Design a protein with these regions (language model features):
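Metal-dependent C-N hydrolase catalytic cores
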Residues: 2-4, 45-115, 289-311, 319-325, ...
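Short, mixed-charge aromatic SLiMs
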Residues: 41-45, 72-73, 154-158, 266-283
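Short, mixed-charge, low-aromatic patches
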Residues: 2-10, 64-69, 88-90, 129-136, ...
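A residue-level signal for conserved active-site and pocket-lining positions in enzyme catalytic cores
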Residues: 64, 179, 249
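Short, surface-exposed amphipathic charged segments that create phosphate/polyanion-binding patches used
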Residues: 77-84, 162-166, 205-208, 285
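Conformational coupling and interaction surfaces
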Residues: 1-3, 19-23, 30, 170-174, ...
Length: 344
């Protein structure tokens, strides 16, 4: 079976990094481009982390394109309290060996599917700012992709950043609303935090298994989630940290992992109290569905894919713990990377 041609939009923090390993090193994905956006961390940091993650996967051939540095109408609210100041657990990762591409993410998101209509699958792991910006220029954008998978929302209205909202939608609800209003269920599938919370939790025994593998990718995946594990223990009440972006990526790579789904009409709340909440209309009189919502996945199958991928031994230029990022700009014109434990 040929690898799935992919374009990935990411605000690369710790779980995005693991999702990039699945796509770039697992053999099921053919990653044509990674676009970055501000979300978990500021844009320059997300771009740096995407470059490092791809290096860890041995894929310095995959281009990385920076995109929007802030939400459409709001100021940036990052998740550095979850992922660390550097977005990768503050473990002192080395600077990337290459620079990102000069072309803007939105131009790439528009241009690639025009050149290859119906061929590419888009996977979004971030606030939907880049995608919404692209839609304002091409309202038919989703018809040009084979399919679009978004790690977005919480279909049970149980949130992680707010009582009823998931971070990616909460961070830029106006962008998420633009996406839902352009979507159709045959083209756009959302995998929400409710799925991750139920079927993608790395319990202590899973974390120990990851650590015992000892490969560069397994060690990377384990260590970059260090601060997420602390946050999960203190805030979510889960048995371990969960992996929302990797499970969304796994669904895109292996849709047969889906065990429960529904089609529904979804809108997004943009008011202060309910900011980012999914409004799902399941009434008989509801408007026509605009999204497919994944509700459950095969947990054993997902974790099998994860462990099989990171168990691979591949050449990589990333040496964990061998040297720390210098704090200098990681590529010409980029801001300096934050030192581990520093505060902006």
């Amino acid at each position: 079976m040929p690898a799935l041609p992919l374009v990935i939009d990411s605000d690369t923090g710790s779980d995005d990094a693991v999702a990039l390993l699945l796509a770039a090193a697992g053999g099921l994905g053919d990653v044509r481009a990674v676009t970055t956006v501000a979300g978990n961390v500021p844009l320059a940091t997300a771009t740096r982390n995407a470059l490092i993650s791809l290096e860890t996967a041995g894929r310095t051939d995959i281009p990385v394109h920076p995109g929007c540095a802030r939400p459409m109408v709001r100021s940036l609210s990052s998740a550095q309290h979850v992922h660390g100041e550097d977005g990768m657990g503050d473990i002192g990762l080395p600077d990337p060996v290459r620079a990102p591409e000069p072309s803007h993410a939105v131009d790439v998101l528009l241009g690639l599917p025009r050149d290859r209509p119906g061929e590419l699958t888009l996977v979004t792991l971030a606030p939907l700012t880049n995608i919404a910006a692209a839609l304002t220029r091409d309202p038919l954008l989703f018809t040009r992709y084979r399919h679009v998978y978004c790690m977005a929302g919480a279909a049970d209205m149980r949130g992680n950043v707010a009582p009823t909202a998931e971070f990616n939608v909460w961070a830029d609800p106006e962008a998420a609303r633009i996406v839902t209003r352009a979507a159709t269920p045959d083209k756009v599938t959302w995998v929400g935090w409710d799925v991750s919370r139920k079927d993608a939790v790395m319990a202590p025994e899973d974390q120990r298994r990851l650590e015992r593998l000892g490969t560069p990718m397994a060690t990377f995946a384990h260590r970059v989630n260090r601060t997420v594990a602390d946050w999960a223990r203190d805030v979510t009440g889960l048995a371990g940290y969960d992996l929302p972006d990797p499970v969304a990526m796994a669904v895109a790579l292996k849709p047969e992992l889906i065990t429960e789904r529904e089609q529904a009409h979804v809108d997004i709340a943009v008011g202060d109290q309910t900011r980012g909440q999914m409004i799902i209309d399941r009434r008989v009189t509801a408007p026509a569905p605009n999204l497919t919502l994944v509700r459950r996945v095969d947990e054993v199958g997902f974790k099998g894919l994860l462990f099989d991928t990171v168990a691979r031994r591949i050449p990589t230029s990333v040496s964990l713990g061998a040297r720390r990022g210098s704090g200098a700009a990681p590529w010409p014109g980029a801001p300096a990377a934050p030192a581990p434990g520093s505060r902006r």
